[in-house]
UniProtKB/Swiss-Prot annotation:
It is found in: Cell outer membrane. One of its GO terms (molecular function) is porin activity. The keyword NADP does not apply. The extracellular loops are most variable in sequence, and in some bacteria confer sensitivity to phage and/or colicins. Keywords: Cell outer membrane, Ion transport, Membrane, Porin, Transmembrane, Transmembrane beta strand, Transport. Monomer and homodimer. It comes from Actinobacillus lignieresii. This is Outer membrane protein A. It is a multi-pass membrane protein.
Length: 21
């Protein structure tokens, strides 16, 4: 699922920035 991977990558980056830890 390429679409899933795309949203997953964005979510990972966003999560990392959102949770600056």
């Amino acid at each position: 699922a390429p679409k899933d991977d795309t949203w997953y990558t964005g979510a990972k980056l966003g999560w990392s920035q959102y949770h600056d830890t």
